[in-house]
């Protein structure tokens, strides 16, 4: 909660709270944590992890989430996307895409924190989830996640050009230039974690760098 408040004070536009171990461990999201964070924050909050059915998403929204992100459950049950969009609205329905580069060409959809390959083509899956009602895509390159080598720009461009909904770039950011490159490559927004957790940059200093690079941001 304190970390969330710190990020808001630094100028974060939105907070994404992902319980990445919830699905592999077969449990639901920690709703008490969501409530505490919601009570402390004024900015939009997206929550994900452990969402296996529409009621799980409903409980997160009741706890204070503005949007709910689904990943593995959307792959095993694609109809869930439409159910979420119908019940709560596309504006609340975020589908996370975890992509791994194929040996040949393109990218394959992976699930369970990158552990399992699905055989699905990422671009085709992106189009399908938008057709089913996803209002936003959270796109992570598992080849870049944690590497601090920058976002996978060709993946970001390919997905952004294939769909009509906002695409948020995730995975690999370590410098302000990485964020600039992602936005120039077609990302509608950028998500960063370790770059802030490590204390190397604040949200404010990154935004100032983005503005100097010609990116419109709210300081």
Tell where the protein language model's regions lie, with residue ranges:
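Charged helix-capping and loop-helix junction motifs
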Residues: 1, 28-35, 78, 119-123, ...
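Conserved anion-binding
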Residues: 61, 65-145
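Conserved beta-strand positions in the central sheet of alpha/beta enzyme cores
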Residues: 15-19, 46, 69-70, 94, ...
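Glycine-rich, proline-tolerant flexible connector loops at the mouths of alpha/beta enzymes
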Residues: 12-33, 72, 138-150
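C-terminal helical cap(s) of enzyme catalytic domains, especially alpha/beta-barrels
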Residues: 80-88, 179-219
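Conserved, mostly hydrophobic/aromatic
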Residues: 7, 15, 47, 60, ...
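Short, acidic/polar
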Residues: 1-8, 52-59, 118-128, 175-179
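Catalytic cores of alpha/beta
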Residues: 41, 45-68, 154-190
């Amino acid at each position: 909660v304190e970390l969330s408040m710190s990020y808001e004070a630094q100028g974060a536009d939105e907070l994404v709270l992902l319980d990445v171990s919830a699905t592999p461990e077969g449990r639901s999201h920690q709703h008490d944590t969501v409530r505490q964070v919601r009570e402390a924050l004024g900015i939009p909050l997206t929550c994900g992890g452990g969402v296996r059915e529409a009621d799980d998403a409903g409980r997160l929204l009741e706890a204070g989430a503005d949007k709910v992100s689904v990943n593995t459950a959307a792959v095993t049950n694609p109809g869930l996307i439409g159910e979420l969009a119908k019940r709560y609205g596309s504006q609340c329905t975020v589908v996370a895409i975890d992509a791994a580069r194929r040996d040949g060409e393109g990218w394959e959809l992976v699930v369970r924190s990158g552990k399992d390959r699905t055989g699905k083509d990422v671009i085709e899956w992106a189009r399908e989830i938008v057709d089913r009602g996803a209002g936003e895509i959270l796109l992570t390159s598992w080849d870049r996640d944690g590497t601090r080598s920058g976002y996978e720009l060709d993946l970001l461009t390919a997905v952004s050009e294939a769909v009509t909904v906002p695409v948020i770039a995730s995975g690999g950011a370590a410098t302000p230039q990485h964020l600039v490159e992602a936005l120039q490559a077609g990302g509608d927004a950028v998500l960063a974690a370790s770059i802030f957790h490590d204390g190397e940059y604040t949200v404010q200093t990154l935004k100032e760098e983005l503005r100097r690079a010609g990116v419109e941001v709210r300081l």
